[in-house]
A protein has these predicted regions:
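Catalytic domains of carbohydrate-active enzymes, especially glycoside hydrolases
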Residues: 48-65, 124-132
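Active-site beta->alpha loop and helix N-cap motifs at the rims of alpha/beta catalytic domains
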Residues: 66-179
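Catalytic alpha/beta core domains of metabolic enzymes, predominantly
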Residues: 196-221
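N-terminal amphipathic alpha-helix/helix-capping segment at the start of soluble metabolic enzymes
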Residues: 16-36
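Targeting/processing segments of secretory and organellar proteins
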Residues: 8-10
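Short hydrophobic alpha-helical segments enriched in small aliphatic residues
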Residues: 3-5
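Short, well-ordered coil/turn segments that N-cap beta-strands
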Residues: 21-23, 58-60, 92-98, 129-132, ...
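Conserved, mostly hydrophobic/aromatic
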Residues: 32, 135, 191
């Protein structure tokens, strides 16, 4: 499909700006690991698909573990630690960054995890080949996220702090931008806009991205 676009400074400033920037893609999974069993991959299947992802040549990052990923390993009777090493190996060789999901205060669980265990978790995951951790709290409670940012940095990982997006009179651009300020000030070099339910309004998300970038131009969103 070929699309002809007449470029003018007035009407297509955004497109012109994007053309001057390097665009990278990150492969992120959502509900596959949380759906019915037939869609939950075993480690032998992940290892088989990894070369194809590399061969595509369009991904700078690939999500490889954390959260539901490692719970599925346990359900299959697999060792999550061995699974992480096996799945990340080829991506590391290809120079593709790998990233995981963690639940802040809850780490990879559904209930709070002691601070010393969380600190050790990041060291272990980094040693297993994981570069980035996407840290989120469903309540956007910064006290559940900021300690994990610091622990991840100590372990040599890149902490990607998350804003869980929803739609209500309370959840405004100012609300989210204020949280982003706190997370970036705590050391997070990246911010993720996590629209788990798919109800974020494009206009609001655009305004939020602009607000964060204007105040933190070096940050990655």
């Amino acid at each position: 499909i070929f699309v002809y676009v007449k470029l003018t400074e007035g009407k297509n400033l955004l497109l012109l700006t994007m053309m001057k920037k390097e665009i990278k893609f990150s492969l992120v999974y959502r509900d596959m690991w949380q759906s019915s069993g037939k869609y939950q991959p075993r480690v032998d299947q992940l290892v088989r698909i990894a070369p194809l992802i590399v061969e595509m040549g369009c991904f700078a990052r690939v999500e490889t573990n954390g959260g539901a990923f490692e719970q599925v390993n346990l359900l299959y009777g697999e060792n999550p630690n061995k699974a992480v090493r096996a799945f990340t190996a080829l991506f590391r060789e290809a120079g593709i960054q790998t990233h995981m999901l963690d639940r802040g205060l809850n780490a990879l669980r559904m209930y709070p995890v002691p601070a010393d265990v969380r600190r050790l978790m990041y060291k272990v995951k980094h040693a297993q080949g994981v570069d980035i951790t996407r840290i989120f709290c469903g309540l956007n409670e910064t006290r559940n996220i900021i300690p994990s940012i610091k622990y991840a940095l100590e372990a040599g990982m890149i902490p990607q702090a998350t804003l869980c997006i929803t739609y209500s009179p309370v959840h405004t651009v100012e609300y989210y931008a204020g949280i982003a300020d706190q997370l970036i000030e705590a050391g997070a070099p990246e911010i993720c806009l996590k629209d788990m339910a798919g109800i974020g309004r494009p206009g609001m998300l655009g305004e939020l991205t602009k607000a964060i970038k204007e105040k933190h131009p070096e940050g990655l969103i």
